[in-house]
Amino acid sequence: MNAMVARLLEQPFVYRWWMAPFAEQKLRPLRENGGTSGVRRVLDVGCGPGTNASEFAHTDYLGIDINPLYIENARGRHPGKFMVADVTTFEAEPDDRFDCILVNSLLHHIPTPEVRRLLGHLETLLTEDGAIHIIELVLPPRPSAPRLLAKLDRGDYPRPRAEWELIFSSHFEPVVCNPHPVGAFGISLWEMIYFKGRRRANAARIRASQ
């Protein structure tokens, strides 16, 4: 992505304007798979300027992001707690546990070793009945508009769908893992993947109780 455009997107107003037409689409699988109903404590990793916060106004919500301008903007617009933090080195309080962890369009900005470290830490923060919800940018294998836009994205690490699935399932027991196209006027502009997972130690117990 052009460096000037990337710098513009670091401004909260510009980022919110750019995301507005697609925010509802991106979060649709989260709603459809119980990510916003009945949850108590939410950790939104890479929360931006509060892009997802309104979905969790009824919860004990913590959003973290490395951009202080995003966090300042989010604090002025939403309830809940927002914290400036580098997600690749973020460490929660020892007793912090969340029944919903959301990672929305963050991991394609991060090299694989840091992604694995982050997901390993997030697994320890889930409650026994909690779930992680991940929405990520896919790099399609063939030339297409979604492949071009993935290449032009600010993130340097869009990955093929199979690679995302392998990364996610190596840390969490899959509950849902589906392709999720996002676009406009019936045209797919980005290929995304939606993943819902649980802590491996608790997945079998939860299935047995349902």
Regions found by a protein language model. Name each.
Residues 102:
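A conserved beta-strand element that flanks and buttresses the S-adenosyl-L-methionine
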Residues 1-92, 110-117, 121, 131-210:
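Class I (Rossmann-like) S-adenosyl-L-methionine-dependent methyltransferase catalytic domain
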Residues 106:
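Hydrophobic adenine-recognition pocket in adenosine-nucleotide-binding enzymes
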